[in-house]
Swiss-Prot record:
This is UPF0145 protein PBPRB0184. It comes from the Bacteria. It comes from Photobacterium profundum (strain SS9). Belongs to the UPF0145 family. HAMAP family: UPF0145.
Length: 103
């Protein structure tokens, strides 16, 4: 599945717009990661546990958006975007969304 952040795909013609696609993941913090993150905020540096967690969540959100597009018969997703929001204390949502199209 071709996924782009632009509204068009160079060299390809969009023949049909199918609709919005989404994929989301709500990820909670692990207590052990949270304790280590607390130390990192005191001493500085990258919080690798959270970086890895968000990277995995972003990949899963994208996979779910692709599955949504495939279920609509799409060849590509254009205008792909990611957003992150806090759902509750200790949990964040990663949302991937875009427009499913046929080429």
């Amino acid at each position: 599945m071709l996924c782009v952040t632009t509204s068009d795909i160079i060299g390809r013609e969009i023949t049909e717009t199918l609709g919005v696609v989404t994929g989301n993941v709500v990820q909670s913090k692990h207590v052990g990661r949270d304790i280590m993150a607390g130390f990192k905020t005191i001493f500085g540096g990258e919080i690798r546990g959270y970086t890895e967690m968000l990277t995995e969540a972003r990949e899963e959100a994208l996979n779910r958006a692709i599955a949504d597009a495939q279920s609509q018969g799409a060849d590509a997703i254009v205008n792909l975007r990611f957003t992150t929001s806090a759902i509750m204390q200790g949990a964040s949502e990663i949302l991937a969304y875009g427009t499913a199209v046929k080429l």
